[in-house]
Curated annotation (Swiss-Prot):
Monomer. The lineage of its organism: Eukaryota, Metazoa, Chordata, Craniata, Vertebrata. It comes from the Eukaryota. Belongs to the beta/gamma-crystallin family. The gene is crygna. It comes from Danio rerio. Crystallins are the dominant structural components of the vertebrate eye lens. Residues 6-46, 47-89, 95-136, 138-180 form the Beta/gamma crystallin 'Greek key' domain. One of its GO terms (molecular function) is structural constituent of eye lens. This is Gamma-crystallin N-A. Pfam families: Crystall.
Length: 183
């Protein structure tokens, strides 16, 4: 399977009303496209997306899969601020990652190939995850709380030497799931 950008449409008003912005790939700043940072509803027509509440792919992350989100509470937003977005890339259907307790791939290591609602159930002794290697084809969503709750971070294929590389402010990760709804 090749990479696919997809399509996402942002609306200023709730229930898909008001001005709209259609995006087909990376968009680092909504204002550069003449769209204010106020988003009250979203329609994902294809693909899976990671959206950020600030420009330049910064701030709180929200994963949006194919479907309709008539108000910001539906994507677990705390307000209507949205500043940038990009499609989550998929290269195939193989998922594999290694999790490390220490920075720079040191300390206890656990391998995942499937969803994990509670990281400590794998034998990982702490909820401190300081570095990861994503080997597989797909992306992963990592959450600060068990059962896929709390602040979320998206990671794609690559090496992340420290938690700051996935834009976290701390190493607390307690659940991880595969991003599977790409189309």
């Amino acid at each position: 399977m090749s990479q696919y950008s997809g399509k996402i449409v942002f609306f200023e008003g709730k229930c898909f009303t008001g001005r709209r912005l259609e995006v087909f790939g990376d968009c680092d700043n909504f204002q550069d496209r003449g769209f204010m940072n106020r988003v009250n509803s979203i329609r994902v027509e294809s693909g899976a997306w990671v959206c950020f509440d600030h420009p330049d792919f910064k701030g709180q992350q929200y994963m949006l899969e194919k479907g309709e989100y008539p108000d910001f509470q539906r994507w677990n937003g705390h307000n209507d601020h949205m500043g940038s977005c990009k499609p989550i890339k998929m290269h195939g259907e193989q998922y594999r990652m290694e999790l490390f307790e220490g920075q720079n791939f040191t300390g206890q290591c656990v391998e995942l190939c499937d969803d994990c609602p509670f990281l400590q159930s794998t034998g990982f002794s702490k909820n401190c995850l300081n570095s990861i290697k994503v080997y597989g084809d797909g992306a992963w969503a990592m959450y600060e709380e068990p059962n896929y709750r709390g602040r979320m971070y998206i990671v794609e294929r690559g090496n992340y030497c420290a938690f700051t590389e996935w834009q976290s402010e701390n190493p607390n990760i307690q659940s991880i799931r595969r991003v599977v709804n790409y189309f």
